[in-house]
């Protein structure tokens, strides 16, 4: 009787990757068809997404940045605090907490396949010789970790492929809890790493850093806004992910009201800085100029500014710490709406603090209609003002009394 109970419990930890026939037989008696008028299909709920086969050559912050950009391309925006990258000898994977309806998660596999065919997924994110795998298999995480780390020494050898009766799988309360525990842990780590006694008189006001052109490590610059984006930029960021972010954010800022990309600042707004020598500055300037020269319409040098702000730290380092600030100025008003595209022919927009794109043909057409509708509304408003002024002038002319003429005969 105990063996049957344990075998029933271990079946809950088996990998969800099985044949469709077997899966349907297991799910049919457990699932009940919801009522047609329930209307709960589109309600978002918190899920944990399992992303495997990540490139182990890159550091954890770089993988988190690339994975965040990839999920945005799949129309699934997440915050960096909701991504936890785990490195294993045989597999590097990530756990991502997302708030999305079930239908959106169910469509992720074919959307990922379409994105791979259209080359929208960054090749650097996936390990060499493997394909990116997205799944919602919380129960199979422990099983997959055992496969990656090898067989357990307590597992009795035998020809039977099934699980051992004496093998017990510990529960995973941290994965079943939908609360964003990674964000609170990250905030505690930030407060511990902040240098003591560090103060800064610098702050971001109207997209400019006031005070001296220097920042203190641990200073708080505020929160991200529609026109302000922060990137931590540690590890191989400048040589790998920075070029992709230049294309995305500069194109989005050009197609909106401008903005700034700050590298060396955490998402929480704390200044950390990046190790950047004079040679790295020259390489970064050449990289930015070469990318923006391929934009269409042409982006002139006065449309953006690239600066490196020194960061004062309590610890001494061989390479100076700096914050990279790439500012795109507000585009000048043109006779007709302009839509910028990158050197790779992609179009991005900035909406509600997130990047939308690359846009499809239909989305670009909708953008053009909205822009022309806005321009038409401005022209109609000007016509109304001019018409009102004309009526007021005509009314003033009517109210004037005619001059009386009198003749005097001498």
Swiss-Prot record:
InterPro entries: Schlafen, Schlafen_AlbA_2_dom, Schlafen_AlbA_2_dom_sf. GO terms for molecular function: ATP binding. Residues 370-401 form a coiled coil. Residues 1-20, 141-199 are annotated as: Disordered. ATP binds at residues 264-271. It holds the Pfam family SLFN_AlbA_2. It comes from the Eukaryota. Belongs to the Schlafen family. Subgroup I subfamily. This is Schlafen-like protein 1. It comes from Mus musculus (Mouse).
């Amino acid at each position: 009787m105990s063996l049957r109970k344990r075998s029933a419990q271990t079946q809950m930890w088996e990998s969800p990757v099985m044949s469709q026939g077997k899966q349907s037989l297991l799910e049919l008696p457990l699932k009940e068809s919801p009522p047609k008028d329930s209307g709960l299909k589109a309600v978002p709920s918190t899920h944990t997404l399992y992303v495997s086969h990540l490139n182990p050559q890159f550091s954890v912050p770089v993988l988190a940045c690339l994975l965040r950009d990839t999920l945005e391309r799949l129309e699934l925006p997440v915050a960096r605090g909701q991504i936890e990258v785990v490195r294993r000898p045989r597999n590097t994977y990530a756990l991502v907490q997302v708030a999305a309806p079930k239908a959106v998660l169910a469509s992720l596999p074919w959307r990922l396949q379409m994105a791979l065919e259209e080359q929208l997924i960054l090749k650097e994110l996936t390990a060499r010789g493997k394909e990116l795998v997205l799944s919602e298999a919380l129960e199979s995480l422990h099983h997959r970790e055992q496969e990656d780390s090898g067989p357990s020494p307590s597992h009795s050898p035998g020809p039977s492929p099934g699980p051992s009766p004496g093998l017990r799988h510990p529960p995973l309360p941290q994965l079943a809890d939908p609360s964003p525990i990674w964000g609170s842990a990250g905030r505690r780590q930030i407060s511990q790493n902040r240098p003591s006694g560090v103060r800064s008189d610098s702050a971001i006001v109207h997209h400019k850093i006031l005070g001296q052109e220097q920042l203190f490590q641990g200073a708080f610059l505020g929160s991200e806004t529609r026109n302000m984006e922060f990137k931590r930029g540690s590890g191989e960021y400048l040589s790998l992910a920075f070029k992709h972010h230049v294309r995305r954010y500069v194109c989005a800022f050009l197609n909106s009201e401008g903005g700034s990309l700050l590298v060396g600042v955490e998402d929480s707004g704390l200044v950390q800085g990046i190790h950047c020598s004079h040679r790295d500055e020259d390489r970064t300037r050449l990289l930015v100029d070469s990318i923006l020269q391929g934009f269409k319409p042409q982006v002139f040098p006065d449309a953006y500014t690239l600066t490196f702000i020194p960061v004062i730290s309590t610890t001494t380092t061989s390479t100076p710490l700096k914050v990279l600030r790439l500012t795109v100025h507000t585009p000048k008003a043109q006779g007709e709406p302009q839509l910028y595209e990158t050197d790779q022919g992609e179009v991005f927009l900035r909406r509600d603090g997130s990047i939308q794109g690359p846009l499809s043909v239909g989305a670009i057409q909708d953008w053009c209609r909205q822009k022309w509708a806005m321009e038409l509304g401005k022209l109609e408003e000007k016509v109304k003002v001019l018409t009102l002024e004309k009526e007021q002038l005509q009314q003033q002319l009517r109210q004037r009394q005619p001059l009386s003429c009198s003749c005097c005969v001498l």
